[in-house]
Amino acid sequence: MTDLVYEQPLNEKIRSYLRLEYLSKQLCNNLNNDHQHRCFYPLFSLCELSERCDYRNEVLKDIERNLLQLSKWQELEHIDSKQITFYIEALTQARESLQRPERCGNQLKQDRFLSALRQRFGMPGACCNFDLPQLHFWLAKPWDERRQDYQAWVSHFEPLLTPIALLLQLTRSTADYAKATAHAGFYQGDSTQALSLVRVKVDAAHGCYPTISGHKNRFAIHFVQFDQQRHSDRSIEFLLATCA
């Protein structure tokens, strides 16, 4: 079997970033594969999240903070200068795209086709052709045409999703995986520096999954046997990364 990676955010900012990243990956998958009407679920979820909260200010602050830190790292010896330069240039470009006055995805509200679909998609079984004949018509179009439409809709969120992907890459890069053991299925850790993300990599052959809880300075991991749906009493070896 293969190793599975589980991530637990330890603050609300990273929690939001991970949700947006999850939707972004679904959007990319829908651009590469024809999933018929299912492609609209992540798109509408992203619309709803962006309407609830304007993430731009938080992301712009995070970009500035990381650019400052990267500039300091540039002055250090034995540093991967090419990698640092890549992130500085990518974040600078992302900052410029995100500084537009209009909220990401706001223009999609004016799209009558999407608005009609979105009103119905929350209802069970509401994608029948008698409920949404316009969807039935759109799905009959060639995949290349539908893909172009979908790319145009997704592009409205790229100024937000691109920097979030970069910021999460930087967050994950702050810690390498290290071997750890959960005795009797339990592991507890602490840190003197503020943590933002706990990552657990465990072999699926163990037949269990971790439930992770905690805050910026302390966290706990309980392993649960999937078949029995109860806490494991076995010692579980896994890989752990605690990201600042």
Curated annotation (Swiss-Prot):
GO cellular component: cell division site; cytoplasm
Coiled-coil regions listed: none
Protein location: Cytoplasm
Stored Pfam families: ZapD
GO biological process: division septum assembly; FtsZ-dependent cytokinesis
InterPro entries: ZapD, ZapD_C, ZapD_sf
Keywords: Cell cycle, Cell division, Cytoplasm, Septation
Gene3D superfamilies for the chain: YacF-like, YacF-like domains
UniProt record similarity statement: Belongs to the ZapD family.
Functional summary from the UniProt entry: Cell division factor that enhances FtsZ-ring assembly. Directly interacts with FtsZ and promotes bundling of FtsZ protofilaments, with a reduction in FtsZ GTPase activity.
Subunit structure: Interacts with FtsZ.
NCBIfam families: PRK05287.1-2 (NF003654), PRK05287.1-3 (NF003655)
PANTHER family, sorted: CELL DIVISION PROTEIN ZAPD
Protein name, per record: Cell division protein ZapD
